[in-house]
């Protein structure tokens, strides 16, 4: 992406909406842009969009991180997301030999320069068999854990070779919920935090579980606008271009915008009787639409997994509140009530105190 396009993005966003904006540098590999790009782009965006209180994030494998780049990013308190799938042997089996060492080398540079790095772990049909080893790796190293399930490839002759089946994903989430509760205070599992918050607030808290249309957009290198970063590079999902200064209404009128609205309408119709609809919203539109060539044939295929973990959390909350001992507490001078094992409310309490 050129600096000219960065300026055009800034001008477009100035009047697009009045909400606070978060800008994530994604790829490909965004560090390939180099230090000079960020040295110019970050002031343009932060000053030009000051009225929107912009914050920034970056997603990278960290291979190209240098002390110079790290220092530039640290000036803007940019958190970095990277990918590690567990111990070196498991990670490199999935991502290629040498990946682990290169990423950890970048991680050490980030740490030395005050950058916060959080790792995303992709669980596949193979690595899920080593879930305890992977969990212990994150626990032992003090890494917060965020996970993704491997999806069927759109570019492979054997698309499901590595894909994690929805049923297995649901059981993995329940397993990690249990492991989290066994190790509260020693590790943070971000997905579990988000899922518990969804249930408690009755509203989705991350893009997978909300109506993301119109609020989570991506801009390609040429200024093309997409519904989200996962659609970048797919011409049929271009909604407009920043050079044309489209309004939210303009984007909604595009073919891709109409498809996103059609998915939302489908969810309202097909999921109306689901107890989780308010904080699930049919899951991720990309997961539902991209594998079918743009045809709406169902909701996110991980619906089974989402129902499994949402049911589990709801059942446990109800049990904690109405059918089991409460957390140890003082009640206006009364004796301490019987101590309960840590549960969902402990997770919520931990989040609230941060």
What residue spans do the PLM features occupy?
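Generic recognition of stable, solvent-exposed alpha-helical segments in well-folded globular domains
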Residues: 1-4, 36, 102-105, 129, ...
């Amino acid at each position: 992406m050129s600096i000219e396009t960065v300026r055009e993005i800034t001008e477009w966003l100035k009047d697009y909406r009045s909400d606070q904006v978060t800008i994530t540098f994604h790829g490909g590999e965004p560090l390939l842009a180099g230090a000079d790009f960020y040295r110019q782009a970050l002031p343009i965006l932060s000053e030009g969009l000051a009225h929107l209180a912009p914050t920034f994030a970056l997603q990278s494998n960290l291979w190209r991180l240098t002390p110079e780049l790290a220092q530039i990013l640290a000036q803007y308190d940019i958190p970095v997301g990277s990918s590690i799938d567990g111990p070196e042997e498991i990670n490199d089996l999935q991502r290629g030999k040498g990946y682990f060492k290169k990423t950890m080398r970048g991680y050490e540079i980030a740490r030395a320069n005050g950058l916060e790095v959080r790792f995303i772990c992709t669980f596949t049909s193979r690595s899920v068999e080593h879930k305890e080893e992977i969990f212990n790796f994150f626990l032992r190293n003090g890494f917060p854990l965020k996970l993704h399930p491997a999806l069927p490839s759109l570019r492979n002759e054997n698309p499901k070779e590595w894909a994690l089946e929805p049923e297995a994903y649901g059981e993995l989430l329940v397993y990690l919920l249990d492991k989290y509760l066994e190790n509260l205070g020693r590790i943070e599992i971000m997905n579990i935090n988000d899922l518990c918050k969804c249930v408690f607030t009755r509203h989705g808290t991350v893009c997978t579980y909300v109506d993301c249309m119109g609020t989570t957009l991506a801009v390609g290198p040429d200024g093309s606008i997409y519904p989200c970063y996962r659609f970048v590079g797919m011409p049929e999902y271009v909604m407009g271009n920043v050079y044309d200064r489209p309004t939210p209404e303009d984007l909604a009128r595009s073919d891709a915008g109409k498809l996103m609205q059609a998915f939302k309408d489908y969810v309202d119709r097909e999921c109306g009787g689901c107890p989780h609809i308010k904080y699930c919203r049919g899951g991720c539109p990309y997961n539902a639409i991209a594998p079918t060539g743009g045809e709406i044939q169902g909701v996110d295929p991980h619906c089974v997994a989402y129902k499994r973990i949402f049911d589990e959390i709801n059942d446990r909350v109800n049990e904690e509140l109405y059918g089991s001992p409460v957390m140890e507490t003082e009640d206006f001078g009364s004796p301490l009530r019987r101590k309960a094992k840590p549960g969902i409310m402990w997770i919520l309490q931990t989040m609230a105190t941060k």
